[in-house]
Amino acid sequence: MSDFQREQRKNEHVEIAMAQSDAMHSDFDKMRFVHHSIPSINVNDIDLTSQTPDLTMAYPVYINAMTGGSEWTKNINEKLAVVARETGLAMAVGSTHAALRNPRMAETFTIARKMNPEGMIFSNVGADVPVEKALEAVELLEAQALQIHVNSPQELVMPEGNREFVTWLDNIASIVSRVSVPVIIKEVGFGMSKELMHDLQQIGVKYVDVSGKGGTNFVDIENERRANKDMDYLSSWGQSTVESLLETTAYQSEISVFASGGLRTPLDAIKSLALGAKATGMSRPFLNQVENNGIAHTVAYVESFIEHMKSIMTMLDAKNIDDLTQKQIVFSPEILSWIEQRNLNIHRG
C-alpha cells in the first residue's frame, strides 16, 4: 500500500466515523443507581482525580485514540491537543504506524505534543509492531503511556487488512517487558472477556481499555470501504462496554481498567467508574465537537461534562471514584443473564 493510499484510508476512517451515530440501545441504559435523597457531601467536596499505580489524571475522562497520518488529521490532532491543554484532559493519538513508516508523517502526531507540551499523551501502535517501533512511538511523542490496539475484527473486514494474529500475544508480552511507560492494551469497539483478561495478566499487562461496542463501529467503517459492502451482518459483533467491565471484575485489583466505547453522557461515564473503571475515554463526541463547533465550544463542552459528573457524584454521595464502586446498582434482566451465563462474580457494597 502506498503512502497516498494510507493517507486516504485515514481520512476515510474519520469521515465515516463522523457520520456514524450512537447505537439506539445502550447497555448503559440497562443499569440504574439507587437514589438516596439526602447527600452528606457538597459538590465542592468531590475529587475526580483518577489514580493508578503509574498514572495520575486530573479527571477520569480522556480524549481517546482517533487519528493522525494525513494533513487533515494533523489539523484534528492539533485542535484536540489544544482542548486537552485547556481542560487538563489526557489525550491519545491514533495509530502511529504512518509516522513510523514515513518520517514525513511524524508531524501529524507530534503536533499534539507541540500544542500541549506539559500534558498527558498516550502514543498508539498495533499488536504486531516490532518492539523497537513501539519504543520509537513512545519517544516520538514523549508519551506518558502507550496504547496497543487489538482490532482483529476490523482487520478481517478491512479489504487490505491483516490476516495473521498468532504472534500478537507474544509480541505484546515483549513490548510490555521493554517499554518503560505504562502499556495499555486497547480494544477498538468490540469489548473484552474474562478469558482475555486472564491471558493478559499472565504476560504482565497492568492496563487495559475494554472499548466495548456501542460507539465508533470499525466493522461498519471497513464494510463501507468494501466493494460489495457484504459484511454488514457483523455490525453488532462483540461485547458492550458494560458487559466488558463486568468481565474484568475479578482482575480489577491487579489490572487498571479504562472504559470506552459508546459513552454518551456524564452518567455513562459515572456508571463506568462505578463498575470499576479508573478512567473513561471518548473519541467521536470530541471529534464531532471540535470539527463542527470549534475549540472554544469543545472546551466548554468538556467543562460542562466534568461539572455534570460532579453533580451526579453528589447525588450518589460519592466523594471520589473509589466511593462509586460501593454504590448500589440495579441491573436489567438482560445484564443479569449475561452475568449468570458467564459465571461472573459481582459483589458490591
Curated annotation (Swiss-Prot):
Matching InterPro entries: Aldolase_TIM (IPR013785), FMN-dep_DH (IPR000262), IPdP_isomerase (IPR011179)
Pfam name, any one: FMN_dh
Cellular component GO terms held in the UniProt record: cytoplasm
SUPFAM superfamilies recorded: FMN-linked oxidoreductases (SSF51395)
Residues at which Mg(2+) binds: 155
Gene3D superfamilies: Aldolase class I (3.20.20.70)
Catalysed reactions listed for this entry: isopentenyl diphosphate = dimethylallyl diphosphate
UniProt keyword list: Cytoplasm, Flavoprotein, FMN, Isomerase, Isoprene biosynthesis, Magnesium, Metal-binding, NADP
Main location: cytoplasm
Cofactors that this protein relies on: FMN; NADPH; Mg(2+)
Top-rank taxon, per record: Bacteria
GO molecular function, a single term: FMN binding
Localization: Cytoplasm
Binding site for substrate: 9-10, 95-97, 154
Biological process (GO), any one: isoprenoid biosynthetic process
Residue numbers binding FMN: 65-67, 95, 124, 186, 211, 216, 262-264, 283-284
EC number(s) reported in the record: 5.3.3.2
Record text on subunit structure and interactions: Homooctamer. Dimer of tetramers.
Chain's role: Involved in the biosynthesis of isoprenoids. Catalyzes the 1,3-allylic rearrangement of the homoallylic substrate isopentenyl (IPP) to its allylic isomer, dimethylallyl diphosphate (DMAPP).
NCBIfam families: IPP_isom_2
Family as reported in the entry's similarity comment: Belongs to the IPP isomerase type 2 family.
PANTHER family: ISOPENTENYL-DIPHOSPHATE DELTA-ISOMERASE
Name used for this protein in its record: Isopentenyl-diphosphate delta-isomerase
Lineage, highest ranks first: Bacteria, Bacillati, Bacillota, Bacilli, Bacillales
Gene that this polypeptide is encoded by: fni
